[in-house]
Regions:
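Short, well-ordered amphipathic alpha-helical segments that serve as non-catalytic structural scaffolds
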Residues: 44, 48, 76-93, 120, ...
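Conserved beta-ketoacyl condensing-enzyme motif
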Residues: 48-130, 141, 277-293
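Acidic-glycine-rich active-site phosphate/pyrophosphate-binding loop
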Residues: 115-130, 169-180, 234-239, 293-307
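Active-site glycine-rich loop that binds ribose-phosphate moieties when present
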Residues: 132, 139, 149-153, 170-196
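Claisen-condensing/thiolase-fold acyl-transfer catalytic domains that form or cleave C-C bonds
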Residues: 112-113, 131-133, 138-159, 259, ...
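A contiguous, well-structured pocket-lining segment that forms one wall/lid of small-molecule binding clefts
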Residues: 68, 72, 90, 98, ...
């Protein structure tokens, strides 16, 4: 079965503490909310400590048009995306020798925070030495579920083409969607949580020799995936596209939906693979926020040790939309696992939807 060979992430140039962002939010939103101090508790209750951004704090104090923000998205997505790819293909944590972009058979590009045609993958391929016949699969609009969905689609590609090497690159510059004049509670909560992130993983078909390329004795191998769309839930999460740009849609009911909907979804998927919740040893969860992680515990009966890696990423980086789960996955790949144990990746996104990926250490 296809397996994970390498991974990378990059730290964007501007590191801001949650305290500093909270002060900025008080300055920007203070006159618009009568209960601003109560609302600002979200910055502390969410347990995010630091976040990385592609622009400095002064940039957010100024007005920017949708066109200007999207132009910056294109420029920075190419710049930082190239860096993440090169790091993934040369990551000495995982690889014996550096791989070349020309060795890749397919390029999955995941994003929801900016738009480009030609897509970012095409622009990157013009700047790195890719084979011009590399298959390009850009995937847009899956939000926080996008990283897990990209993982699923890449695994399925390598299952069909067992000699293939493919990358999944996720670029999310959530901060470029910031609306300083949006005085909705959703925008304030989003400001307390979201950040910028770039991550990349390298996946290989089972006819690609792990012994030739990998420093690791164990790898997470793909077993199955499941995509699920909840009917009549379009208003739970997503964007409203307006003249000024992208406005966040973020329902307060998301934790409740997870508690009620996720467990039967996960259990039926595991049963189809002859497993139960207790068989999952590594839970590779997208940390949508502290309340989302708490909802995982309540819905699935997992203790805090099962979400420790996810919680660590949330504390250090915040919610980077689709990129976040790949940061979590990299932590598991560095740590390694016991042969035969199962890992389950899970992420939730607009639709409302979920993506589950079942893997096993081999």
């Amino acid at each position: 079965m296809p397996y994970l060979l390498s991974a990378s992430h990059i730290k964007l140039p501007y590191l801001l503490s949650q305290e500093k962002i909270m002060e900025f939010s008080r300055e920007i939103f203070g006159s618009s909310f009568k209960n601003i101090e109560r609302l600002l508790r979200a910055f502390k209750n969410g347990q995010v400590e630091n976040r990385y951004f592609s622009n400095d704090l002064e940039w957010f104090k100024e007005e920017h048009t949708f066109a200007e923000k999207n132009d910056i998205y294109i420029q920075q997505a190419v710049e930082f995306g190239k860096e993440a790819i090169e790091k993934c293909l040369a990551n000495t944590e995982f690889l014996i020798d550096k791989l070349q972009p020309s060795e890749l058979d397919a390029f999955f590009y995941i994003s929801s925070t900016g738009m480009a045609t030609p897509t970012i993958d095409a622009r990157i391929m013009n700047e790195l030495p890719f084979n011009p016949h590399t298959k390009r699969i850009p995937i847009w609009g899956l939000g926080c579920a996008g990283g897990a969905s990209g993982l699923s689609r890449a695994f399925e590609y390598c299952k069909a083409y067992p000699k293939a090497k493919v990358i999944v690159l996720s670029v999310e510059l959530c901060s470029l969607t910031f609306q300083r004049n949006d005085i909705s509670k959703s925008n304030l909560i989003g400001t307390s949580l979201f950040s910028d992130g770039i991550s990349c993983v390298l996946i290989c078909g089972d006819e690609v020799s792990a012994e030739k390329f990998s420093k690791k004795d164990q790898h997470l191998k793909f077993l199955d995936s499941q995509s699920t769309l909840m009917p009549n839930s379009l208003d739970v999460m997503g964007w409203e596209v307006k003249d000024q740009g992208l406005y966040v849609v973020f329902s307060k009911d998301i934790p409740t939906i997870i508690k009620d909907w996720l467990k039967p979804n996960v259990e039926s998927f595991l049963v189809e693979n002859g497993l139960m919740l207790g068989d999952v040893k590594d839970f590779i969860a997208h940390p949508g926020g502290k309340k989302v992680i708490d909802a995982y515990h309540e819905a699935l009966g997992f203790n805090e040790s099962m979400t420790a890696e996810s919680m660590g990423i949330l504390r250090e980086f915040g919610n980077m939309s689709s990129a976040t789960i790949l940061y979590v996955l990299e932590r598991f790949m560095i740590r390694g696992g016991n042969i035969g144990e199962y890992g389950l990746a899970a992420a939730l996104g607009p639709g409302f939807s979920s993506e589950l990926v079942l893997m096993r250490w081999k």
